[in-house]
Amino acid sequence: MGSEGWSRRRFVGALTGAGAAAVLPACNDAPPPTDPTAAEAGTSTPEASTSAPARSRAPSGPRPLYVGTYTSVEGGGTGIGLATYDATSGRITKTGTLTGVGDPSYLAVHPNGRTLYAVNEREAGAVTAVRLSDRKVLGSRSTGGGGPCHLSVHPGGRWLLSANYTSGSVAVHPIDASGALGERADLVTHSSPAPGPGQEGPHAHQFVTSPDGGHVLAVDLGTDTVYTYRLDERTGRLGEVAQAHTRPGAGPRHLTFHPGGRYAYLANEVDNTVAVCAYDPDGGRLTVGDAQSTGTGSGTNYPAQILVTSNGAYAYLANRGHNSLTRYAVEADGARLRLLDTVPVSGDFPRQIAFSPDGTLLFAANQKSGTVSVFHVDEDSGELRLAGEPFASPVAVCALPL
């Protein structure tokens, strides 16, 4: 099944039960595909903001929803789940499955809304492009590493960024005018610093672009480090400019930026904390603040992903072990998080969360229960209200609402 590191990441939930392991916030300018209610696609041969989009009026009619899964585990899916959701009620309706994409555990959409990208989380990792208008798989490219677990599209739309968990590396692929991927432009392995306590090597977990677009940041759970790079937008090559270190053993997993662009919030998987980080857009330097509580007690929790509302007033953290969402008030223009409460997620092992494009709904992909929970988000209070019964989807590990 691959290396020890990949097995731990993929099956971390086995410590508390059976099962298989953003934002992904939807791009707010992404139109729906031509036929969002298309039925099951035929078998084919083988994003990028980290905060909520600005609120707008809820669109009318069904909106597309894509659900990532594992295809190579017992009880897993057979491809990318296709569904629609009602932007007012939050109700999800299944429309089919896009087959021909193996282990699509994380998804992102191109800024123009025409192409969907998926990782193929396997030992020989790859990324796959899918044209949304007719659900055609445009092809896959090697990530140069094992267990790719995250990807995002650079805001310019010309480069795909991906993170290889097992090999602790990040990759860059060119995107052509059709949305298809070219040969890998760069691959960087996190060889320094040395792995943190209890880690056997680097484990890249996320690769995203800063709000100003000037830098790309890679979060590595294995080295307790966030790496900042400059991306050469002509060649796709990466140049490291800074490293930010958490406390030893924190195990950083996912980062999200405040809309103001001067602060970011880091979810630490291993020590069950979050941290406020100051960010200097000129030099790309991130400074990690003190660890803060997730509000889940002392038990094993595995925080997964953190999101911030478009008005910068509230943040939400997915807690896989506690099966909850922690709600924080964001204060001092982004410099401070104040814990408010935790809300049951109505599912088991919420691995990923995402806002709808208008920010009125929050989707949680619950890996072990095989469900997607939807919550109404109160703009003024930040309170979450469950929108009906969770939607059944096998080994749901990523929900991408457009």
Question: What feature does the model see in each segment?
Answer:
Residues 23-61:
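N-terminal low-complexity, Pro/Thr-rich disordered segments
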Residues 70-72, 121-122, 165, 175, ...:
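Short loop/turn segments immediately following the C-termini of beta-strands
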Residues 76, 101-111, 144-155, 192-211, ...:
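Beta-rich, blade/repeat-based domains predominating
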Residues 2-4, 10-29:
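N-terminal export signals
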